[in-house]
Amino acid sequence: LDSFSDESRKILKTGEDLAPQTLDPDSDTLLILTPLKNSAKHLAKYFELIDKLKYPRHKISLAILVSDSTDNTLQQVVKAKKKYQERGPKEKRFGRFEIYRQDFFYTLPRNDRHLYKNQFDRRSLMARARNYLWTRALENEQWVLWIDGDLVEYAPSLVNDMIAFDKDVLVANCVVLKTYGTYKGKKIVYDLNSWQETPESMEMLKKLKEDDFLVEGDGTPFTTHRKHLNGFGKDDIIVPLDGVGGTFTLIKSHVHRSGVGFPAWLYEHQVETEGFAKLAKAHGFGVFGLPNHHVRHESE
């Protein structure tokens, strides 16, 4: 301490005095975050899957945002909270169960939501919803898990498995069971937002205008040449990524606490979860994916 100024020594002394009263993140608590819109029909399966998680229930907190719903999503979530936190057995109670309501007054027919012309407004609104949720719900948890409300299958041990990798940002591979067409009866990739840049995609990026907006998939004006999470092999246990989706994404809470959220504006030609991944990497955090750890989305 001899080399410190008097002011620096005072700062250090204050820190020592306050340390016992400062809350450090609990090393294994988990906050599940889910934004919902018109999701009443999915909620039974949503809670069924969470109930099957092998992670200790008392270490799990749950925060749900209900937005722009015209069905009884909110009423169903309130009913679920009473069931778990008041009427049900104590061993089934969550650490916290928070419900938020915020409308953004944006409507879009479900069948049109993947059209390129709608993507920027849609994804920007989703970014706003995610930011609204995590900035209000995150308290002292160490881990944040973003889960889509319309998943129908994932392994009970998946959270434990993902935490064991100890990565800043880690995403599972989201697939869907096709019920029609060429791939009927087969599981194919659903979430193309988890990807890795390639030499070809890096060349493509150099040719873009500043306000060009990139979206993965068919029907877009740009061929990105990126390698999607489903493009890796069986031996690729964990791979570095440059973009992520939000269907089942585990994040160390200090990533959010450092100020990394979901951009509702263009950041390196991306918004929302893909923009989040770009921001996280710019802040020095690691972003990874698990090609062979699957979650299954509701069929369309």
Locate predicted features.
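Short, acidic, metal-binding catalytic loop of nucleotide-sugar glycosyltransferases
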Residues: 48-59, 69, 79-84
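Conserved catalytic core of nucleotide-sugar-dependent glycosyltransferases
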Residues: 134, 152-253, 257-263
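Active-site-proximal specificity loops/subdomain of glycosyltransferases
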Residues: 72-141
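N-proximal low-complexity "stem/linker" segments adjacent to membrane-targeting elements
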Residues: 1-52
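Catalytic donor-sugar/metal-binding loop of nucleotide-sugar-dependent glycosyltransferases
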Residues: 238-241, 246-257, 264-267, 274-296
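Short loop->beta transition adjacent to catalytic acidic/histidine clusters or analogous donor-positioning motifs
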Residues: 29-30, 53-64, 85-89, 95-97
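Short beta-strand/turn micro-motifs composed of small residues
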Residues: 34-36, 66, 147, 291
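Acidic donor-binding/catalytic loop of UDP-sugar-dependent glycosyltransferases
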Residues: 72, 127, 131, 135, ...
